[in-house]
Every structure is written in structure tokens, then in C-alpha cells.
């Protein structure tokens, strides 16, 4: 089959099915025969779109980061950088809930072109830098703060999907931890709550439960 004759829907279906098999059953479950059965195509179709299983695994990870990037890119910069960071957190959670099979695998397989993953993290680093430049956070190296925010979001989402936290507990925990981090970075508590509330209403459609006191 020539490249022009390739069907992007089949390629996407192969990636989705591979992500599901990898996430639910591990790498040993990813075979051409099982993948073809999942998608309802021939084993040769796998090699039409990918050079082999290793390339497919890398492409699954790349696709996960591409989808995350699309959600993050949908958050424009505003004049409130803490709102923007909160909105990025909402976008991160929405992507994880929507594309969880890809999400579970994308951090386990390191794509050869690291720019795919690094670009998404750089968006968070830039968001922290903007908050520092605006005087909301104390000025310092933005990398540690961005790392803490990412670890928070990733950990809470993972615990929710593992059944350890209900959705309400997930949202409340995320909100309270973010508030503690924002104020720890130097933001005024009331200003942080106002920024976070606006972002919550944008991504979740309603305000979260009353905010707990920052530690």
C-alpha cells in the first residue's frame, strides 16, 4: 500500500489499541496478531503503518504527548499567570481522563525525539516563569516549582485512576495541594484562590468544594 493510500483512521486505531493492550496487559500482550484482531485488520496492516513493534511503542508514547500538547496549547496566556497555571492543570487532568490508556503508557516509553515530551513540560516551566515575572511568585529557578506542580498533578490523577480517590476527592486534593504550592511559591492566598476558582469554573463547569486552609 502506498503512503497516499494509507488510512489515517486505521493508523489511529492501531495506536489506540496498542495503548490499551500495553496499559492493561503489559508489553508481552502487544503482538501483531493480537493487535490486528483488536482493530479488525490484517497483520500486514501493522507493517504498512509501522516498521515494527518498537516503532509502534514509540509512536504510542509520541501520540500521548501530542494529545497532551494539544490540550495545553488550547490554554492561551492571559494577564493572570496563576489562572493560566491552574487552567493548564485542568487541561492536564482532562487529557489524562480522556486518553487514559495513552496517558498510562506515555511516561513509561521514552520517545527517541525527546522534544515531544519536553515541549509539554516547557509549557509548565514557562507558566511558572510568567508568574515570577508578574510578581505573583518569588523569583527563582522556575524548574523546581514546575516539577512540583507536575508531580502533584500526575500523582493525583494516577491515584484516582487506581481507585484510591473518588472524583470529588481527586478534585479537592488537587485544589488544596495547588493552593499550598502557589502560596509556598509566594502568591497571596486570596489572589491564588480567585485565580484558581476561575480556572475551575472553566474546566470543570462548577466551583469545587470550599477551600481548605493552606498549610
Residue ranges and their predicted role:
Residues 108, 114, 133-180, 185-204, ...:
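Hydrophobic/aromatic-rich alpha-helical bundle segments in the mid-to-C-terminal region
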Residues 73-104, 111-112, 121, 146-149:
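Hydrophobic alpha-helical connector segments
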Residues 2, 58, 62-87, 114-118, ...:
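Amphipathic alpha-helical linker/stalk segments
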Residues 86, 90, 121, 125, ...:
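An amphipathic alpha-helix signature
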Residues 13, 17, 21-55, 59:
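Helix-turn-helix
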Residues 94-137, 163-167:
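Short secondary-structure transition hinges
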Residues 17-25, 67-78, 152-159:
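Solvent-exposed, amphipathic alpha-helical segments
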Amino acid at each position: 500500500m502506498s503512503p497516499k493510500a494509507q488510512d489515517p483512521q486505521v493508523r489511529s486505531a492501531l495506536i489506540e489499541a496498542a495503548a490499551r493492550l500495553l496499559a492493561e496487559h503489559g508489553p508481552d500482550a502487544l503482538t501483531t496478531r493480537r493487535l490486528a484482531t483488536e482493530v479488525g485488520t490484517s497483520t500486514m496492516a501493522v507493517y504498512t503503518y509501522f516498521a515494527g513493534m518498537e516503532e509502534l511503542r514509540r509512536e504510542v508514547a509520541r501520540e500521548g504527548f501530542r494529545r497532551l500538547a494539544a490540550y495545553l496549547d488550547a490554554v492561551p496566556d492571559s494577564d493572570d499567570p496563576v489562572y493560566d497555571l491552574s487552567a493548564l492543570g485542568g487541561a492536564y487532568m482532562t487529557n489524562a481522563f480522556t486518553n487514559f490508556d495513552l496517558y498510562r503508557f506515555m511516561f513509561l516509553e521514552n520517545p527517541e525525539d525527546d522534544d515531544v515530551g519536553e515541549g509539554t513540560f516547557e509549557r509548565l516551566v514557562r507558566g511558572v516563569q510568567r508568574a515570577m515575572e508578574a510578581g505573583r511568585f518569588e523569583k527563582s529557578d522556575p524548574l523546581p516549582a514546575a516539577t512540583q506542580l507536575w508531580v502533584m498533578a500526575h500523582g493525583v490523577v494516577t491515584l484516582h485512576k487506581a481507585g484510591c480517590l473518588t472524583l470529588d476527592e481527586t478534585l479537592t486534593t488537587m485544589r488544596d495541594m495547588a493552593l499550598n504550592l502557589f502560596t509556598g511559591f509566594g502568591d497571596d492566598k486570596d489572589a491564588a484562590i480567585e485565580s484558581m476558582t476561575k480556572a475551575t469554573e472553566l474546566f470543570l463547569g462548577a466551583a469545587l468544594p470550599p477551600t481548605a486552609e493552606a498549610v
